Amino acid sequence: MPDVITCGEMLIDFVSTVSGVTLVEAPAFEKAPGGAPANVAVGLARLGVSTGFVGKLGDDDFGRYLQSVLEANGVDTSRLQFTSEARTALAFVSLREDGEREFVFYRHPSADMLYAPHEVHVPYIARARVFHFGSITLGAEPGASATLHAAHVARENGLFVSYDPNLRLSLWPSAEAAREGMLRGWEYANLIKISEEEAEFLSGTDDLERAVQDLWHGNLRLLAVTQGEQGATFFAPGKSGYVPGFMVRAVDTTGAGDAFLAGLLFSLYPNLDRLTHGDLDEDELRQAVRFANAAGALATTRRGAIPALPTLEEVQRLLATGD
């Protein structure tokens, strides 16, 4: 049985082959498997952790292709659902010169939105050690109820719960709906990863310390705020710190946050009980975030999300050399 289970969307990213152009100007697109929770599952598997993915794909060529990608990377798909009622989600991605992205999603609806609460396999989740989910599937029913049901099962069975509220305003009817939807998963989590932009959006303040104060809750043991190439800042009960990033040549930042989160979970995994009880010291947390920064940086050096996720050897090499 997998030690880590991730839940949510998986899709096909069509990434512009040329940077610095709009979607309309792009001469061609390269197919790349992605979807934040699936990226985390593959990212952890490449680092050597046993993982499984739950959610729903279209019973179509793209859905079966995505299943094969997961399996080729060692991710268990035994509880993956398929439907003929909707297609597998697609996203078209244009890249700025610095590797940052703009998205156009095709989900009207997509299969991941139709994942239903009765399809959540309770024993499968209950036997794991870590459960990770994101916010994209919280935007529509029945996917939202299924995702939250899975998170509830995880919490009730003592799993360590990780959450990634992913800000994609185009997927919500309004900014307020996005804020409310993203916060629906907040209280379930022991670990949360957000960007500076997401922290400001959810809290309403650009003062990071104030934002963290406002967003903190009793179950939370670690909040990691990513800051792009600058690195990340972490907050834990009685501890906090900034950890600088690694300078690499960024080609495509798609999946960088997911690689960061996979790296963070990998680093913390042997000490989850100590983290839960507040027993990790500041230096141990810094080392975990440094590993996560290295994984995130490496993911920007290749196009696509899953194709760019690094191996343990690649992360260790960057940690050792700094370049």
Task: Show the residue positions of the predicted features.
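Glycine-rich phosphate/pyrophosphate-binding beta-alpha loops
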Residues: 89, 135-139, 296, 302-305
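Conserved phosphate-binding/catalytic region of the ribokinase-like
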Residues: 2-5, 152-153, 204-323
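Conserved N-terminal subdomain of the carbohydrate kinase-like
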Residues: 50-135, 317-323
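Acidic, amphipathic alpha-helical patches
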Residues: 121, 179-182, 250
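Conserved beta-alpha-beta core of the PfkB/ribokinase-like small-molecule kinase fold
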Residues: 130, 136-214, 220-222, 230-231
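Short beta-strand scaffold segments in enzyme catalytic cores
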Residues: 42, 90-94, 231-234
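Glycine-rich phosphate/adenosyl-contacting loop at the front of the ribokinase-like
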Residues: 1-76, 115
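Short gly/ser/thr-rich secondary-structure transition/capping motifs
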Residues: 109-118, 171-177, 205, 277
